[in-house]
Amino acid sequence: MAFFNPYFKSKNKGSDMPPKQSMSFTKQHKTKESAFLSITPECIIKPKSSKLLKKYNGEQPRLFYNGEPVLLYTVREISQWPVKDIMKVNNGTVDGSCNVVSTSHEPDSPVKNNCEETVVFHIYEQCVFCAHDVSYEYLPWRYKRFLSPTGTIISLIGKTEDGTDVCVNVHGQAYYFYVAMKDEAATRDAVSKVMSNLEKESSSCSYVMKSVNKMSLMGFNTNTSSYLMMIFSNHFVGKEAARNLKDLDFEIFEHLVEPNTRFLVDNEFCSFGWYSLKTPYVRQTSKDSNCELELDCCVGDLQVLRDRVDWPNYKCMAFDIECLSGSVDDAFPDATNPDDIIIQISCVCFDIKNTIETQHLFTLGSCAEIPGVYIYECASEYELIESFLTFVRVYGPNFITGYNINAFDIPYVIGRCRYYNIQCGAFTKMKRGRMTCFKGMESFLNRCQCKVTISGIVIIDMYRVCMDKVSAPNHKLDTVVDMLLGEKKHSVSYKQIPVLFRRDDDGRAVVGAYCVHDSVLVHKLFCKLLFHYEASAIARLSNISINKVVFDGQQSRIFTCMLAAARREGLIIPSIDEAGEDTYQGATVLEPKTGFYNTPVAVFDFASLYPSIIQAYNLCYCTLITDNYVASLREEDITMVTTNTGRVHRFVKPHVRKSILSQLLTSWLAERKAVREKLKHCKDPLMQILLDKQQLALKLTCNAVYGFTGVSKGMFPCLAIAESVTAQGRQLLAVTKQYICDRFNDWTFLTQIAPELVDCPVDSNRFKIDVVYGDTDSVFVLLCGIENADRLYSALPNFVAHITKTLFPPPIKLEVDKVFEKLLLLCKKRYVGVLHGEEKLSMKGIDLVRRNVCGFVKNTTLAVIKSLFSDNVISEAVQKMSGMTQDQVCKEGLPPGFFKLVALITDARERLYENRVDIHELQLSATLTQACDKYKQQNLPHLTVVRKKLERREEIPNTGDRIFYVLLAHPDERVANYVIAEDPDYVETHRLQINCSKYFSNLISSITHSISPIFPEFISKPDRFLMSCVPRKTYPKPILN
């Protein structure tokens, strides 16, 4: 197929003359104002060239499809993409036309202007903007009156029942906040002055002041107070007024609550769900959105349909971009560099029900055919970006996904739009929409946190989802799809892309197929992990948008729920100033009694400990007693909590006032129980997924309540609540331990509470029940001398039931979590054991569980640990050895069974020094948490590898990736690891020697740390002791290059 570049003469493939133009081509503008900067790789007309051709062009931007030019402005005007009525999809056929097609005429509206019909529609996102009445003269007065002179409009984005994209503009939702009034006249006077100053700054807005009686959520109170309620038609002006009043030291309440949150909370609406709409007004012209159907209504016209949980068939799109660096060394591209251009963009379009998939590729220059892919050729990067954005606008995806798109693809597209002065927000669901990216602070736990906003579209980055949901050695796309899908990416390296792209049409097709395949894989991950269902369940429960679920964390979820609950009780939430520096002690860990236990150890676990503490002790902002109210309450009305720091917090009991947090938790837990019951009897596969995600959302939200109160920089922190929760948790652990140690060593008592133990054989010399460890919400109970294991295990539920009934107020409950048949308890947070009924080991905090340990060390250490539990000879030997004194070791020697364990280590050393260990088993890794130059400590092995890759002009890893490296042989045995770190692929290719001494030392260290309790107490350096037990042998020194 010939490709004609209308801006540069071609002596290559194709004609010098343009294809026959359509009638729409007659409209040309060549004014300087309409000219755009055309950047074109010279390779598309002169193969293998690395130059860029630049000139200003006054022609209309266009793309080429099937050799025919298509003007982009005509596509946008008629909302018609050139691909339509295409049956062929991925070399197969589908019923109907390509789902990219939008009709070129106005959609058949289900209603007419001002008629009495009802529209049923589903929403997934809300957009908020301010409007001026002079711009909406065409609207009926019932809507326009809310815009005088300016007003807030909430646009609900979704679909009607027949699948039509809809934007419902809701009028009449005011923004408001409260001001505490000590002196009403003085307060009103101060407000008037603030508003007068704002008017001078041209902030036109109507507002109303009225006195209301409310109670603050913060602190127990029995009397209402007078507050000034400030109601604004324009929320931007309202927020500015609140800030000015705060600066004047007025106490402000709820000024950070957004209008769409007010809309949802005040009217008990739903952020993700179905609505019915009475008497809508249909916008035929002057639309604010790019949706097919746009309606206007008042708040009172809407009715939420809470019983409906099904989804309309939303449109989705996975995309990926490929870039070309303009630097001589093909360095990693940077959007701010004018010569680092986007060369290809792939889009895979599919519906939420996953019934159809179409594949599209936008490319610079001509491209050979790729089976099943629609190819759109562009002559310049400007036209490539415009074509892609036009495609997004015409297709109108509701969900956009990709892999690392938040940190790279979307910011890169936005950066190039900024370079060309393209208003990318106009291509969103809203005509005055936003397409922005904010890069937040980087940290180890929140790598490269980028918040992306595309008005009316949900952004789900599968890289972030996989980071949270998938445990993998690294989270590169190739690794994740191999684990989850059993598939591989196309084998095109970063360095091959420029070479292939510059070569010819076929080379660009190889790069294009690679680009499209990445989007296909992301589509499959999207449908595999189903995070959109989980996010929608959380959004629905918390009354926030899905995008807030994705980007804003747990704080906004709990705050919105609390706002709704407080409103029902007539309480208002104070706006918190910058939090103080006070801290509190976190969860308790009981000091472990380390050792190897060749006897059952039961783990008793508190069910939902922190939520149940909040419920049991009525902890809340509104039940917290301040000094002013202590004297007016009786002792029996108060729960006192004393912390380890000596601070005392007091809360009223439920009969005085019920905790709002407790009510929320009780409601959520009851709902979760009901949902799980429904799930047991559900037969529909999709409904099973929805119910499962709903119960998971309820669980996650319950567990987030405690954290919400304890984050000092959060939306509404309360140190007293967070500190009281952990203090009560410590008390519960201590009481449980004391009760078990005091009462459970009486065999008669045990048979009374657990009839299963009657007539059970017991070794009176060995009988002992003790708590050997406690961690946050669980206790480890040693059970010695009870010889019938089956009876013992069947008695455990009675043990915890008795403890719960005797010690704890409801709903605090102790449960049997698991039972270890053998346990190696190393220290706090570190143990390994064999669970009853299972053969595999259960570990926590052991070196071989961590990802920065190589496979050789991990597997050998695991083999040694397994031998402790599977080989009785070794088990008995190490148990005996752990209790030996120095004199006993000198006289008797070490138990023979211990040397069976040593033999495993000796064999591993032989394989290592004889080069029988695969290099991939020797890989170490670390996460690149930030750019190399931002590290305070530069002498780190993984940074050495990144720098070496840069020097060799290899593909550079992204922030958040795990960097793999191996340690090379070196004449100095004490050389630092960062000096000898190297990329494993490079080592394998060049057959470099491995530093066997380093790896064997790491092995010895890992094993000693993992089994340290088996060594006698008099041994101060177990690693040296273990090394001395391994027979010595001399190996040839490596030949260094």
From Swiss-Prot:
Q: Which SMART domains does its entry note?
A: POLBc
Keywords from the named record: DNA replication, DNA-binding, DNA-directed DNA polymerase, Endonuclease, Host nucleus, Hydrolase, Multifunctional enzyme, Nuclease, Nucleotidyltransferase, Transferase, Viral DNA replication
Q: Which InterPro entries match?
A: DNA-dir_DNA_pol_B, DNA-dir_DNA_pol_B_CS, DNA-dir_DNA_pol_B_exonuc, DNA-dir_DNA_pol_B_multi_dom, DNA/RNA_pol_sf, DNA_pol_B_thumb, DNA_pol_palm_dom_sf, DNA_pol_type-B
Pfam families per the UniProt record, alphabetical: DNA_pol_B, DNA_pol_B_exo1
Instruction: Give the reactions, separated by semicolons, that this protein catalyses.
Output: DNA(n) + a 2'-deoxyribonucleoside 5'-triphosphate = DNA(n+1) + diphosphate; Endonucleolytic cleavage to 5'-phosphomonoester
- GO cellular component entries: host cell nucleus
Question: Looking at the record, which segments are called Disordered?
Answer: 1-23
Give GO BP annotations, semicolon-separated.
DNA-templated DNA replication; viral DNA genome replication
Q: What does the UniProt entry say about where the protein is found?
A: Host nucleus
Cite the EC number.
2.7.7.7, 3.1.26.4
Disulfide cysteine pairs (residue numbers)? none
Grouped into one coarse class, the protein's main location is: host cell
* Family recorded in the similarity comment: Belongs to the DNA polymerase type-B family.
Q: Please explain the role this protein plays, according to its UniProt record.
A: Replicates viral genomic DNA. The replication complex is composed of six viral proteins: the DNA polymerase, processivity factor, primase, primase-associated factor, helicase, and ssDNA-binding protein. Additionally, the polymerase contains an intrinsic ribonuclease H (RNase H) activity that specifically degrades RNA/DNA heteroduplexes or duplex DNA substrates in the 5' to 3' direction. Therefore, it can catalyze the excision of the RNA primers that initiate the synthesis of Okazaki fragments at a replication fork during viral DNA replication.
Q: Under what name is this protein listed?
A: DNA polymerase catalytic subunit
Origin organism of this chain?
Answer: Elephantid herpesvirus 1 (isolate Asian elephant/Berlin/Kiba/1998)
